Curated annotation (Swiss-Prot):
Presence of the UniProt keyword Cytoplasm in the record: no
Lineage of the species this protein comes from: Eukaryota, Metazoa, Chordata, Craniata, Vertebrata
Keywords of this entry: Disulfide bond, Glycoprotein, Milk protein, Secreted, Signal, Transport
InterPro entries hit by this protein: Calycin, Lipocalin, Lipocln_cytosolic_FA-bd_dom, Maj_urinary
Disulfide linkage: 87-180
PANTHER family, per the entry: LIPOCALIN, MAJOR URINARY PROTEIN 1-RELATED
Signal peptide region: 1-15
Subunit description: Homodimer.
Subcellular location(s) per record: Secreted
Gene Ontology CC annotations of this record: extracellular space
Organism field: Trichosurus vulpecula (Brush-tailed possum)
Residues bearing glycans: 67, 148
SUPFAM superfamilies attached to this UniProt entry: Lipocalins
Protein name per its UniProtKB record: Trichosurin
Length: 180
């Protein structure tokens, strides 16, 4: 009797989740299409960090996204960054991991990159756990398809990170700043 109930429960769960009957290859293709939605042009709108110096002018994470492409599940980013008053190109690749929504990036130390949330035609949020010189810092990026996102989206981003312990002065709206 217990086995029958367990079997019925499992059948019900699988019935509610169509992935149970799909092959891993089908799931992989679906995930790839989802990530492809992130491809194309983006703008850096808001930056947040546990260490403000990382996102201040000429800081290592004060980078202006131009484009994202997805290849084999890896995220390739083309950024502009300002060094010594000059804008220089910066190409970064975040490599997919076994964990959903997590990537690895070698830049200014090593980084665990998490894809937070998005509406792919409007905005995307990425969170970096940066390991550099024995310190761990958190950096968050809000990217928009246009340079100016609604105040509602920016406010949700700010509230989310203030609830995680960020101080308001460590959240910078750079939508009006010269992006090179």
């Amino acid at each position: 009797m217990k086995l029958l109930l367990l079997s019925m429960g499992l059948a019900l769960v699988c019935g509610l989740q169509p992935e149970c009957s799909r092959s891993e290859e089908d799931l992989s293709d679906e995930k790839e299409r989802k990530w492809e939605q992130l491809s194309r042009h983006w703008h850096t709108v808001v930056l947040a960090s546990s260490d403000r110096s990382l996102i201040e002018e000429e800081g290592p994470f004060r980078n202006f996204i131009q484009n994202i492409t997805v290849e084999s599940g890896n995220l390739n980013g083309f950024f502009l960054t300002r060094k010594n008053g000059q804008c220089i190109p910066l190409y970064l690749t975040a490599f997919k991991t076994e964990e959903a929504r997590q990537f690895k990036l070698n830049y200014y130390g090593t980084n665990d990159v998490y894809y937070g949330s998005s509406k792919p035609n409007e905005y995307a949020k990425f969170i970096f756990y940066n390991y550099h010189d024995g310190k761990v810092n958190v950096v968050a990026n809000l990217f928009g398809r246009t340079p100016n996102l609604s105040n509602e989206i920016k406010k949700r981003f700010e509230e989310d990170f203030m609830n995680r312990g960020f101080r308001r002065e460590n959240i910078l709206d750079i939508s009006e700043v010269d992006h090179c």
